[in-house]
């Protein structure tokens, strides 16, 4: 009998390697399902084992191809519901469609994050688990419980293992100050802020650096790296101000377009990301990019949800500061 007899984990095609690592930590087998496509491109899902009354988790990021991966979650949830699963949790480490979380004044645009929340709920999902939401307020778009866990303990563990000298934490923009301040506090080090203005989407201009980075090892922390334009410009600005080294730690490795090439040819000494999104072949081959797995943290979170234990306990300030929250 498995260690967690009522817990089952299924996955789609988005990130099967992460799912395998999570169930390995839980000492259970990955749920068997046939996930593919019909000849016309429609998503096809069939569960290959009994789920009646079980506590089921669908572990799947909605990274690219975003629409296919989202539809796999929705169709799998429907299949689980019709097969009488006891509880269905969508564990979505990277929650796509999170960037449109409001309707700017006079703009005729959707609030896509709310739309996706409605779709997940309508499909029969009882609970959502995600990692480092792009905007915390998205939790309020759901009428079901949402656990937004943080990759901070995983990243801090990796940072401490590197034993960096003369470290200073850098927020890449004003919006990331809360995250950067929490990391700086846990590491008992200084904080710097990059003040930038973004003239249009995915284009950033570094304007000013608040804090003295001369001769320091600069640690940029962010929730995601998309095109890497902002990150590379920030690294150049820090080096121009006398930074000795520039490192970047981020949760989600989106790496759109020429992001990997930009990182490879930039002033960044090392980029560390988690495995919420699988790396492309180019990213895996890049010597400047390294992965710190979040599988252990996700496994412990799933275990706690299954056993009705506190999830917020994992992010107790003292435990995070010492690394004791990780399994």
Swiss-Prot record:
Subcellular location: Cytoplasm
Cofactor note: Binds 2 Mg(2+) ions per subunit.
Binding site for Mg(2+) 2: 173
SUPFAM superfamilies: PRTase-like
Keywords noted in UniProt: ATP-binding, Cytoplasm, Kinase, Magnesium, Metal-binding, Nucleotide biosynthesis, Nucleotide-binding, Transferase
Positions with a binding annotation for ATP: 40-42, 99-100
Cofactor needs: Mg(2+)
EC number, UniProt record: 2.7.6.1
Entry-linked Pfam families: Pribosyl_synth, Pribosyltran_N
Recorded metabolic or biological pathway in which this protein acts: Metabolic intermediate biosynthesis; 5-phospho-alpha-D-ribose 1-diphosphate biosynthesis; 5-phospho-alpha-D-ribose 1-diphosphate from D-ribose 5-phosphate (route I): step 1/1
One function term, GO molecular function aspect: kinase activity
HAMAP family xref list: RibP_PPkinase_B
Task of the protein: Involved in the biosynthesis of the central metabolite phospho-alpha-D-ribosyl-1-pyrophosphate (PRPP) via the transfer of pyrophosphoryl group from ATP to 1-hydroxyl of ribose-5-phosphate (Rib-5-P).
Similarity comment: family membership: Belongs to the ribose-phosphate pyrophosphokinase family. Class I subfamily.
Subunit structure: Homohexamer.
Identification of the protein by name: Ribose-phosphate pyrophosphokinase
Organism expressing this protein natively: Chromobacterium violaceum (strain ATCC 12472 / DSM 30191 / JCM 1249 / CCUG 213 / NBRC 12614 / NCIMB 9131 / NCTC 9757 / MK)
């Amino acid at each position: 009998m498995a260690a967690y007899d009522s817990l089952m984990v299924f996955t789609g095609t988005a990130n099967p390697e992460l799912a395998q690592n999570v169930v390995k930590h839980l000492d259970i087998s990955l749920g068997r399902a046939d996930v593919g496509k019909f000849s016309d491109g429609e998503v096809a899902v069939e569960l290959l084992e009994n789920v009646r009354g079980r506590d089921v988790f669908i572990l799947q990021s909605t990274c690219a191809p975003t629409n296919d991966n989202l539809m796999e979650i929705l169709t799998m949830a429907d299949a689980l519901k019709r097969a009488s699963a006891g509880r269905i949790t969508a564990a979505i480490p990277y929650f796509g469609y999170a960037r449109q979380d409001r309707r700017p004044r006079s703009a005729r645009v959707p609030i896509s994050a709310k739309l996706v929340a409605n779709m997940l709920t309508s499909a029969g999902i009882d609970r959502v688990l995600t990692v480092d939401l792009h905007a915390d307020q998205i939790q309020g778009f759901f009428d079901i419980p949402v656990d937004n866990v943080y990759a901070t303990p995983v990243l801090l563990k990796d940072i401490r293992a590197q034993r960096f000298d003369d470290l200073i934490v850098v927020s890449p923009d004003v919006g990331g100050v809360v995250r950067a301040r929490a990391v700086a506090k846990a590491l008992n080090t200084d904080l710097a802020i990059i003040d930038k203005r973004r003239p249009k989407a995915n284009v950033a201009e570094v304007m000013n650096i608040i804090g003295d980075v001369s001769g320091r090892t600069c640690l940029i922390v962010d929730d995601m790296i998309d095109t890497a334009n902002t990150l590379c410009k920030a690294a150049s600005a820090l080096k121009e101000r006398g930074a000795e080294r520039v490192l970047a730690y981020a949760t989600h490795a989106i790496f759109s377009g020429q992001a990997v090439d930009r990182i490879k040819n930039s002033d960044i000494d090392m980029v560390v990301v988690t495995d919420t999104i699988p790396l492309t072949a180019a990213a895996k081959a890049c010597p400047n990019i390294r992965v710190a797995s979040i599988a252990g943290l996700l496994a412990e979170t799933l275990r706690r949800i299954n056993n009705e234990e506190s999830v917020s306990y994992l992010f107790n300030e003292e435990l995070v500061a010492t690394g004791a929250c990780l399994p």
